[in-house]
């Protein structure tokens, strides 16, 4: 099946019932677009008794069809959900996997309900509620604390093809002097500002070294893209979705990415400090800082832009801080 909103209700019902994912007495009322999917095609099936979320990967990035992407990524995401949901402490944060069609690269998830992600915190003076921020840290802390046996780690996909694609946008593309992306179309003056970092050979060397670590294996199960777009608030509860970039790697990666987004969203410094304090554990704070710096740089001068409400001067201050975190923590 090729997933789209144009599929008839009867065809969708037949497909889901043939797979035993809907009961014979259930009906499909309509199909909806649940949100803006970057990587995959996502459809909400609204039924008379319950709703389902269908998610299908294609051989390209859904938002940028010109960018090839490994079609197997949906299977990796499914394995993350299966592994993480086996842990009672994490189950409450995640959607349940209803079914998986390997041939169609399609996964069916329970619909957590109509909510909103946390990208609203990028707007001016929109602090994240204390209980939600605490839940975001708790999920990461519990996930990273899990100790899996060597057989489980070996059997889990390395997700290397998707990581290599991501590596390009994290560690390479933002630092290319002529990558075809005019940052002045995002904000006048940003292109000239970015050139400071695109031409900094010492910084680029440190970033390249970080990229090698990103592509290496580790022993901690990571979400892989832990930022406000992967967090949902549904029925006053914090949820986590979209772990398609997951892999076993260094815990510092997820934490550094999270801190970077809180900083770009201009969350209070005291809240950022609370995140580190609550997470606790034995982590390499210098490495966390480097990942934080990398994520800030790639989001401001790279392709994957955010809805930041920052002046050019505020972005300049963030870029300076990010570069310092990368070079001084090496």
Roles of regions detected by a PLM:
Residues 146, 211-220:
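Protein kinase catalytic-loop region centered on the HRD/HxD motif
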Residues 225, 229-231:
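Catalytic-loop signature of eukaryotic-like protein kinases
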Residues 1-8, 155-210, 301:
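Active-site catalytic-loop/activation-segment of kinase and kinase-like phosphoryl-transfer enzymes
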Residues 64-66, 73, 219-221, 232-273:
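Active-site Asp-x-Gly
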